[in-house]
């Protein structure tokens, strides 16, 4: 195993815990950016170009018949082939959190339609499900099993907001483990069926799942109800005859206690588990090898990588599987330095790499026609993410040109900012105050100076006043700047004075010219 530090030369502020990586024919693509996509890359999907230990995020485009794909954190992803012999594969994306902390229940299918030297074109389609549709969730897993020449998606675990009937003002943003049901999803016809298995008693999230042929292994995970990381190991086998599918579960010994671990495949029947947590505030520094042979699973410890001091002393870490036995890891930067990075990134190679190190992309070294092992890399968001978002997600690189000058900086206009010295709005404890609020606080724009956003609740605004200000075009000043605004009296409008026209210095004559004959006639007339 080799650990190498890499530098992200652009768009480093977009990488955050909960992102996902997709590997298409050796090319790695980044998905799940921080904030909503901007005009530089409206798709939110980037090509992760690695060259000489430098990483560049290159924008990709969608085809005209594609649907919109929001940036999702902690979704369930897996590869999908029509059959085991098929060479082309697609990625299935289900659930996840949007930048507004809304949990998605949609399922998307990603495939590549065109590749050239400059940009990659994806086709993204939304799949509608009928039947026992899984509720919106995140931190779960989805895998594909193959049996009797047919394929089926298997979805399990995750967390979601409490049902609307159980949500109270004090616990409006509280989450709970989803019921321990196993969902079978037919991607061809869009049918979903749920199964209740007696062996699965408690809900799990941020677990590791491995799929091979008709079998899925689930190990580790975190139970929110009991606040434990059980060392369970489940084997779920799916049989797909002509009639109804048969699903059975077996509890196996030899599991490990870990959550938010990353799984990567090193060869046909061997996988490596990296990272994760064994306690709420303790990282799991050891790695394990998982071998799948003859319908058996074997878990054993392996040589620990030479972790750097920064990784050892970091409270959190996160990452995703790049494919080909390589893991992309990130840790928070050092906030004590004057100029600090938001995150530091590393590449951990768990498999022997015989390819040239100067190669720009990773080549797929898998020779098996079976579906590669699927895992969903996660980070315990309730335990680590929200604390990291407050001080670590605003890191920016000096070469980062992603944020255009004419667009607002989301780190300054977010809903969870400290709007004033007395602001007490916290993402973990906030509850709706106005009837118009649902899952984020109402805000109003202060027109003082360059302007800034404040929480309406912190300004003690009545709901009627808030609605009136939101509907009108009147300027609003927050409690801190209202006295300054009152002191700046605008002078009353004065009508301009009518200036009399300037008189000519010489008095003009009548304009009549008397000839000498007329003068003589007038002289004789009056005489």
Curated annotation (Swiss-Prot):
Polar residues bias spans: 358-370
Residue positions binding Zn(2+) 2: 446, 452, 478, 481
Database matches in Pfam families: RAG2 (PF03089), RAG2_PHD (PF13341)
Single biological process term from Gene Ontology: T cell differentiation in thymus
Tissue: Cells of the B- and T-lymphocyte lineages.
PHD-type zinc finger segments: 416-484
CC annotations in GO: DNA recombinase complex; nucleoplasm
Membrane-spanning intervals of the chain: none
Keyword Phosphoprotein: no
Principal cellular location given in the protein's record: nucleus
Record GO terms (molecular function): chromatin binding; histone H3K4me3 reader activity; phosphatidylinositol binding; phosphatidylinositol-3,4,5-trisphosphate binding; phosphatidylinositol-3,4-bisphosphate binding; phosphatidylinositol-3,5-bisphosphate binding; phosphatidylinositol-4,5-bisphosphate binding; sequence-specific DNA binding
Subcellular location: Nucleus
Entry keyword set: Chromatin regulator, Disease variant, DNA recombination, Metal-binding, Nucleus, SCID, Zinc, Zinc-finger
Disordered: region residues: 357-380
Extent of Acidic residues compositional bias: 371-380
SUPFAM superfamilies: FYVE/PHD zinc finger, Galactose oxidase, central domain
Protein residues bound to Zn(2+) 1: 419, 423, 455, 458
This protein's domain notes: The atypical PHD-type zinc finger recognizes and binds histone H3 trimethylated on 'Lys-4' (H3K4me3). The presence Tyr-445 instead of a carboxylate in classical PHD-type zinc fingers results in an enhanced binding to H3K4me3 in presence of dimethylated on 'Arg-2' (H3R2me2) rather than inhibited.
Subunit architecture: Component of the RAG complex composed of core components RAG1 and RAG2, and associated component HMGB1 or HMGB2.
Role this protein plays: Core component of the RAG complex, a multiprotein complex that mediates the DNA cleavage phase during V(D)J recombination. V(D)J recombination assembles a diverse repertoire of immunoglobulin and T-cell receptor genes in developing B and T-lymphocytes through rearrangement of different V (variable), in some cases D (diversity), and J (joining) gene segments.
Family per record: Belongs to the RAG2 family.
Illness the protein is tied to: Combined cellular and humoral immune defects with granulomas: Immunodeficiency disease with granulomas in the skin, mucous membranes, and internal organs. Other characteristics include hypogammaglobulinemia, a diminished number of T and B-cells, and sparse thymic tissue on ultrasonography.
Listed name of the protein: V(D)J recombination-activating protein 2
Primary gene name: RAG2
